Amino acid sequence: MEEFVIPVYSEDEIPYALLSRYPLAIQTNVKIEDVEGKHNVVKIPESDMIDIPKLTIVEAMNYKPARNDGIVVPRLLDITLRAYDDRKSTKSARGIEFMTNARWMKWAIDDRMDIQPLKVTLDHYCSVNHQLFNCVVKANAANADTIYYDYFPLEDYKKRCNHTNLDLLRSLTNMELFHALQGAAYSIKSSYELVAYSERGSLEETYVVGQPKWIHLTRGTRIGNSGLSYERFISSMVQVSVNGKIPDEIANEIAQLNRIRAEWITATYDRGRIRALELCSILSTIGRKMLNTHEEPKDEMDLSTRFQFKLDEKFNRADSEHVNIFGVRGPATDEGRFYALIAIAATDTQKGRVWRTNPYPCLRGALVAAECELGDVYSTLRRVYTWSLRPEYGQHERQLENNKYVFNRINLFDSNLAVGDQIIHWRYEVKASAETTYDSGYMCRHEAEEDELLCKINEDKYKEMLDRMIQGGWDQERFKLHNILTDPNLLTIDFEKDAYLNSRSELVLPDYFDKWISSPMFNARLRITKGEIGTSKKDDPWNNRAVRGYIKPLAESLDFVLGPYYDLRLLFFDETLSLKQEQSAVFQYLSQLDDFPALTQLRGDAVCPHSGGALYTFRKVALFLIGNYEKLSPDLHEGMEHQRYVHPSTGGTYQKRVLEMKDSCQLTCFVIDYIFEKREQLRDTKEARYIVYLIQSLTGTQRLSVLRSTFPNFFQRLLMLKEIKFVRDLNVINFLPLMFLVHDNISYWHRQWSIPMVLFDDTIKLIPVEVGAYANRFGFKSFMNFTRFHPGELKKKQIAEDIHKEFGVVAFEYYTNTKISQGNVHTPVMTTKMDVLRVHLSSLCAGLADSVVYTLPVAHPKKCIVLIIVGDDKLEPHTRSEQIVSRYNYSRKHICGIVSVTIGQNSQLRVHTSGIVKHRVCDKFILKHKCKVILVRMPGYVFGNDELMTKLLNV
């Protein structure tokens, strides 16, 4: 067969029953009307396309596809063709057989993050319908296995858009590098009502029981978020009672709980009225609404099930604690008992006290719901219901029941606090770059100003850890940096728990309040102090809410490594699906930075989020990282000892290569190539990603084999760790986290595992760095700060001490044999967001172009494929062809022809062919009906059968 026929028809003119024998057909009478010349992407959720939800972009990035009629990996054919080409012949008892590189093929498929969850329909003729905005493409089921959608956000010439390599944009969102950063803050809990019942004139004055005193306030004054009452409260000049209050955000959910409670009370506490699944669902909703930190969603299924069992247990009238709770009289009420039982069930599920920072929505929601009725939950449980935490949950937390915790961490991106409202917030200052020499290097100096507190390594605790390390090697689960720091400890400070009302209802603030805490090892000083809301909440995250607060794009905040002291927010906002919407003001801000034109080749205020924002951010990160590692090189700088330089800095001869980078794995490989292999060429993106995958997934001799073959000079340096001779031999340790921790589609097995890194302090130390505990993600931040420190030439040449030799052996064993990444990625969420980003970007630029791609196999005289592309008229046919072919990274040589069909809103048909393919558009008459057909011809070539693609996909 040399011809392939594609009918182009309208059901108004000819029924599909007459055309269903054709493998492919295009129906033009079903379309979605354009609005102002653009595709109405708002209609995607109600159309049979792919599953993109009608949510905000922040919610959509965490959305798990609901309707899934099957998934398609757009580049699967590209991958299998490469695997087919690379098969090796082997001899077996059955003769010559061909073996596929299964490891590579599995990686290439798993590495893809553009999976499409399809929403397609099957008609009565067993055809699979793929809906486009201007038509419907019908394919016989036998031919549908390789069809995929291709969405392209059109480029706005005013912004000088360049929408190639949108994979980089997806990578940056995964690694929390396409975000704004804003300081953490605290306010009085919205579920509390604080009522004054006595006042004093000074902190030295004590409150007299039963003799209330009033100076500026009056009895019953409610403490708000501003004004005199707040000032008196925050100054600890007033005693308050803590009552529950229902925040507006969760009023509906609390009403549902109270309805269940009323039925339960009316039915004389019948457990049958308590449906644990329903209760848990409502509490989870409350927990999600009252989230104060923004991070990836938790899979709470197992814990939720345990919580439901505990709810059933506690509402059983035969349960001993149920009996005790109902045996208490006095101020106890049935309304309170309902929430007391919920709180006890949550505590038993957690096996300890539940705080607002609990990561599980159902438990966090249980606490918040109980607060609305009981005020401070654990104080009320002890005081009113005579219930305390079980001894096995820890004596320390039992002591906290005497206190009331009235402050709650708030996320300033989300908070509805009004202008003028008072807050407590963190100020975070990073040490500026400094001038030094190659002889001096850049060491960590633990110094503080006279009025500053200092957070550094506690020498005694460090020595204890060192002894354990020498005895038993590196203990990644128990070695913690926070365990060896002095107080105030920046890794354990939690103002929400450190500030409280004591048993006399006096506000107690921590000793570190309103004082600068300096920590040179984190290159920062921090201070928690009083603040004020300066701007109202906006949808745009680029909005500095606090007076004297801070907000930074990630390109300017690589040194902000202490994650608990700030919040992050994606730089996209508003609806995922929109015809046209405003983009964040952050991109205009970036365009004003001095190095923006050099890193993007763009000028002016109109900036594309990708070609301006994403490219600038990635390149700035790359320059910063390479600049740190270049100075950390173990090589000596003979004759340059007194040469001066500024560190850290982002200048260097490697900037040209950075401008060519397309992927974070290229950056990882380039650092090793440039510094150790003296190679300035970039590796191909696919090669770099596979190298990093192998290093992260293999262990032992297999990992070493990859390093030996890929980075031979680096490998020799790595072997030196087993026999350290000079201090400079330790430098290689701090290169290893770059290879093991950084990727855009991995998950750590446990983000609180600690890896060994060298801290070039007054004395060189091997310290534990938790892989994801400070910044919560799979990128550079957990370790980047420690790469800035490097010894000078004088220090490098020193003979290594015995303890340094221990460092080398321990680090070599750990990094050779440990898998840090390759944990469980939430695949349905992580891998399906490429098209979400494309469609959202289209609303910020010039709209969307859509198409589907169909693959036609050719069997003779050579095996190859022809791509049939059916799309709209937003792109020229030859332009669309070039774009789609460019995505076949591995198997482009097998594409021998292209048919590009465009259908306009008015059903106008255009066809473009190239390669071995020729075409002709004809009229076809069947009985009294008429349609157009595209005759696709390949002179001298023969099409393959339907199952040729099946065989290829099972190579």
Curated annotation (Swiss-Prot):
Does Hydrolase count among this protein's keywords?
Answer: no
The places in or outside the cell where this protein is found are: Virion
Q: Which GO terms describe its molecular function?
A: structural molecule activity
Q: Name one GO cellular component term.
A: viral inner capsid
Query: Which cysteine pairs are covalently linked by disulfides here?
Result: none
At the top level of its lineage, which domain of life is listed? Viruses
Q: Extract one GO BP annotation from the record.
A: virion attachment to host cell
Give one Pfam hit by family name. Orbi_VP2
Q: What does UniProt give as the signal peptide span? A: none
- Provide this UniProt record's keywords sorted from A to Z: Capsid protein, Clathrin-mediated endocytosis of virus by host, Host-virus interaction, Inner capsid protein, Viral attachment to host cell, Viral penetration into host cytoplasm, Virion, Virus endocytosis by host, Virus entry into host cell
InterPro entries tied to this protein: Capsid_VP2_Orbivir
Q: Where is the major localization of this protein?
A: virion
Q: What does this protein do?
A: The VP2 protein is one of the two proteins (with VP5) which constitute the virus particle outer capsid. It is the major target of the host immunogenic response. Responsible for viral attachment to target host cell, probably by binding to sialic acid. This attachment induces virion internalization predominantly through clathrin-dependent endocytosis.
Q: Which family does it belong to?
A: Belongs to the orbivirus VP2 family.
- Tell me the protein's name: Outer capsid protein VP2
Organism, as annotated: Bluetongue virus 17 (isolate USA) (BTV 17)
Which gene carries the instructions for this protein? Segment-2
